[in-house]
Amino acid sequence: MKVAYLLVLFTIMMLANDASLVHTNIPCRGTSDCYEPCEKKYNCARAKCMNRHCNCYNNCPWR
C-alpha cells in the first residue's frame, strides 16, 4: 500500500513540474540560445532547446 501511495505522489509531482513548461516558437541551436529570450519573456532563465525550439520553464523559485 505504501508503494502505491508513493507512486501516485511521484506521478503528481512529475505532472506538476511538466505543467510549468511553456513551448515556444523561439528558434535555437543549443540550450544556451534559450536562456536570454526565456528570461525576457517569462522572467525565468530556466530553458531547454528541444527540436530546435526553446522550451521555457516558468517555475523559478526566487519569484
From Swiss-Prot:
Keyword Glycosyltransferase set for record: no
Site positions for Aromatic residue of the functional dyad: 57
> Residues of the signal sequence?
1-21
Q: Where is this site: Important for activity?
A: 50-51
Q: What does this protein do?
A: Blocks voltage-gated potassium channels Kv1.1/KCNA1 and Kv1.3/KCNA3. Causes paralysis to crickets.
Give the record's family classification: Belongs to the short scorpion toxin superfamily. Potassium channel inhibitor family. Alpha-KTx 06 subfamily.
The record's note on its domains: Has the structural arrangement of an alpha-helix connected to a beta-sheet by disulfide bonds (CSalpha/beta).
Record-given protein name? Potassium channel toxin alpha-KTx 6.11
Tell me which species this is from.
Opisthacanthus madagascariensis (Scorpion)
Q: What is the lineage of its organism?
A: Eukaryota, Metazoa, Ecdysozoa, Arthropoda, Chelicerata
